[in-house]
Structures are given as structure tokens and as C-alpha cells.
Amino acid sequence: MNLNELRDNAGSRYRKKRLGRGIGSGKGKTSGKGVKGQKAREGVSLNGFEGGQLPLYRRLPKRGFKNIFRKEYAPVNLGALDKAIADGKIDAGTVVTEDVLRTAGLVGSGKFAGVRLLAKGELARAVTIEVSGASATAVAAVEKAGGSVRTKAARDEAQAPA
């Protein structure tokens, strides 16, 4: 078989039905739209319109609200941090801050209030990490590897005047 002998399977491609081309075509006159009425007209699609019946979105009660003061934290997993150190994107000897994580590409470009360290994956080396927040299991895993974690809450408490 040569490239010039390739053919589509029979029935895999078919022409679309041309509408409004006489009764004999099978799709003539009303072109499959039935008779009269709003749905037979042009440009009918009104999303959520139920013909004067109270629409579903108005029948159901309102729920919840959007908190405009919500703080969103970028998640960074220990496995990703360990891989970045192994790849040479982060120097294990320095303090790993949020800026270091951002330059290494572990934190996205979105507007985040800070970075939260999570415990997914393994950390094989001792690292000092300074982030906005960390899960208890992540802190335990870092300390088990011989490193330490400082969170923003702990820093603020330490700097607060007595």
C-alpha cells in the first residue's frame, strides 16, 4: 500500500444536509424546524428563558457570598521542593524564602497572599524554609530531615512588642 492509495473508511465522511432546497430533499420547506412559533424563528436561543414560566435560576433560593477579603495561598509540596533542589534551581545551603520559590518556578504568577508548605512527597535533605504557612505534617517532615520551618505567624509573634 502506498500513500496515494490511502482512502477514508466508507461512511466516515458525509456531506451535511442542505436545508430548504425543496420538499424532495427531505429537509425542505421548514428545514426541520417544525411550524411557526418562537423556536422556528431566527436568533431564538435565549439562555435560561422558559417561555414565561418562572425560570429555574429564579425559583431556587440565593446561597452563599464571595468574600472579597479572602487570602489565597500558593501551595508548594515537599516533593516539588526536593526536586527543585536536586535539579539545582534552589541552593539547599541558603534560606528558602517565598521569593526563592517564585524564581525557581514553584509558585505560579497569580496574586497570592503567600506560600503554604504542604507535605506531599519526601524531603531528603536539611533545608531552612521561611514561608507564610505550613501544615503540621510538612513541618514534621522537614524537621525529620534535619531542617527547620519558620512561618509568618511565628515571625510576627516573635517581633511583636512585649
Swiss-Prot record:
Q: Which HAMAP family match?
A: Ribosomal_uL15
Residue span of region Disordered: 1-39
Q: Which GO terms describe its molecular function?
A: rRNA binding; structural constituent of ribosome
Quaternary structure, per UniProt, is: Part of the 50S ribosomal subunit.
Feature: compositional bias, Gly residues = 21-35
Cellular component terms per the entry's GO annotation: cytosolic large ribosomal subunit
Keyword presence, Cell membrane: no
Q: What family is it from?
A: Belongs to the universal ribosomal protein uL15 family.
Q: What does this protein do?
A: Binds to the 23S rRNA.
Return the Pfam families for the record. Ribosomal_L27A (PF00828)
Q: What is this protein called?
A: Large ribosomal subunit protein uL15
What lineage does UniProt assign to this protein's organism? Bacteria, Pseudomonadati, Pseudomonadota, Alphaproteobacteria, Acetobacterales
* Keyword list, A-Z: Ribonucleoprotein, Ribosomal protein, RNA-binding, rRNA-binding
Its GO biological process annotations read: translation
Keyword rRNA-binding attributed: yes
